[in-house]
Amino acid sequence: MFSETFVPSIFSYKHRLLHLSVLFFIVPYWYSYYNDQHRLSSYSVETAMFLSWERAIVKPGAMFKKAVIGFNCNVDLIVSGVRVVDALNTTCSEGKDQETLETLADLHQTFAHFFQRGAAAERYMSSEDQFNLLVAESEASTRSHHHIGGNAALMADRIAANFPSTEVYLVGPIGPRSQALLHPSVKRTNSTRILKDELHVILEYKQGEILGDWVAPSSSRFITSHDHFSGSMVVMEMFFKAIAQFRPDLVVITGVHLLEFQSKEMRQEKMRLIKRNLLQIPPKVPIHLELGSLADEIFSTDVINKILPYVDSLGINEQELTFLSHIANGPHMEEYPVQAGTVHVHKVVEMLHWLLKTYGRDPTGQIASKTGYRLSRIHFHCLTYHIMVSSGTDWSNLAAGLAAGARIAGRLSCNIGANTMDSELLEIRTPANFVLDKKIEKNYQFEAHNPIASWMREDVLFVFTPVLVCRLPSKTVGIDDAISATGLLYSQFYRLNRPTHW
């Protein structure tokens, strides 16, 4: 038998108050922990992902105060693509991608080409008469809707509505209807007002819709237009003049893809104008380029070489990324055109790494051929996942920007309110596990409560998240612009070196 002296004094009867206090601490702790685990396990996958994004979204220490955005603005006429194309009385035996549409038959062929792939695209209609016929047929549709359109106007509208502390100045051709549709706090210039709005016809279709012998594998849209002003020299000059006058701490340039349909001489002159003015913007002011649908290889090569290196940030989707890789001898050239579904993540990672390393800023400043290069951030978005890529130290808070963009993607498609969460309308479409980066053998294991993954490859940071996809989307147009604008405003930019004054 042990004597009482062997019993530690802490367990003696004299310390009963200590025992009770420890007990009163442990019991609530374990009860709270059990309840938290039980509550988390009771969430649906969709709700768990949404709450995880909410936790990741933190506003940057210094928000952008002033933004100048240009230069394409129009009114989107959104219609049922299948209904309108069927009503055109044209025939189409096979889909074929036309760089420029001259007739309604060309429209039918090109629409069918992308429809059977479920891929978004945009093409210019060279004949004003044919375009007016399409507009008349579209406006006669019982389900036509008018919305603000154009990448610049959509991004300005999104920032004004969701980031009231940021003053937004939009430069673009603004007609009477777009003037009424724009958010009232968006500042605009009278010098680019037009009497009649530019119209873009948005031919939307839903997954499972039938056009002739083809079935749409996913919901998407086809855009066509006959713009007069968005790519005009006057609008572009006013855009860069506004930058000098307004002195913003953020510049967003969009609509460059609309120059593709102009004469070679005209677009070369405008490309020189853009590059010359980009070089005059101080390095402390970030420039974001939102890319649009491209088809002409010569023009797109000019964009890659003459504009892309001289912006700080790029917004891009899978069609645009694979096309750039295809024409510039990048990795996985065979992925263009994108077929039904999305490109494997590890292939997109390879293309993004190539794009940033080839056309991005040299943090060391030792590569002479990259003098003046600024690109250090890419925000990639497709239907099922988003990736943020960055090099150097200029950009931070990137996971918050990625999560904020991912959070709104499916919600906008389904038209779900900001303060509601209807998980039945959304679904996850990525596998439970897959390869993120083959080169460094980085794998992804899906966890609904922690969907965001990040890793370094050489000096490049990657941040990845799957996205909740709308099962029955009510709209597809404008989602990319909203994602990019939201991700950009949650990102923080600060360049330490090369101080410059306006």
From Swiss-Prot:
Cofactor names: Mg(2+)
Catalytic activity line of the entry: D-glucose + ADP = D-glucose 6-phosphate + AMP + H(+)
Gene Ontology, cellular component aspect: endoplasmic reticulum; extracellular region
GO biological process: glucose metabolic process; glycolytic process
Sorted UniProt keywords: Glycolysis, Glycoprotein, Kinase, Magnesium, Metal-binding, Secreted, Signal, Transferase
UniProt binding sites for Mg(2+): 290, 320, 481
InterPro entries (alphabetical): ADP_PFK/GK, Ribokinase-like
Signal peptide (UniProt feature, chain positions): 1-32
GO MF term list: ADP-specific glucokinase activity; metal ion binding
Keyword check for Chaperone: no
Enzyme Commission numbers on file: 2.7.1.147
Compartment(s) where it occurs, according to its Swiss-Prot or TrEMBL record: Secreted
Residues bearing attached sugar chains per UniProt: 89, 190
Domain ADPK: 44-497
Pathway(s) served: Carbohydrate degradation; glycolysis
Class in the EC hierarchy, top level: transferase
Keyword Cell cycle annotated: no
Active site, renumbered: 481 (proton acceptor)
Cofactor binding description: Binds 1 Mg(2+) ion per subunit.
Pfam family, one: ADP_PFK_GK
Oligomeric form and interacting partners: Monomer.
Task performed by this protein: Catalyzes the phosphorylation of D-glucose to D-glucose 6-phosphate using ADP as the phosphate donor. GDP and CDP can replace ADP, but with reduced efficiency.
Protein family (similarity comment): Belongs to the ADP-dependent glucokinase family.
The protein's name in its UniProt record: Probable ADP-dependent glucokinase
Protein's organism: Caenorhabditis elegans
